[in-house]
């Protein structure tokens, strides 16, 4: 089992949007605990806990291991709640609950029931994504985005389970 994965999350920095890599791996057999490193604000940390708990409630496989997530660039404080979708996807990939999709980015807040909620500053986040090397972006269905069809591959999600019906390529 490959246990090292990455995903990019679009977030707001001090003066602009950033595309921050989140790295994840299985630590050992365990019970679904997640160790987190990389300068997260309280709200960003709580968002990661929410993503973990959604998986704990819906995946028997997830609870068999303990994990480590590292948010790259530790000197950059990670604020806000739009990390939720990226954390959920990364933890799903690591645990094997979802087949790994390489070279993607995600932004979206989650609620306790797995709904993907709209995020602020979507235009800025799309600009940051356009500068990245990511080929596919997952965003909330309810975010209004400029017409980017044909330029980028974007998949909109209303619920985390929507990823299962997403067509790639």
Residue ranges, per PLM feature:
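Peripheral, non-AAA+ core regions of ATP-driven protein-machinery
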Residues: 1-169
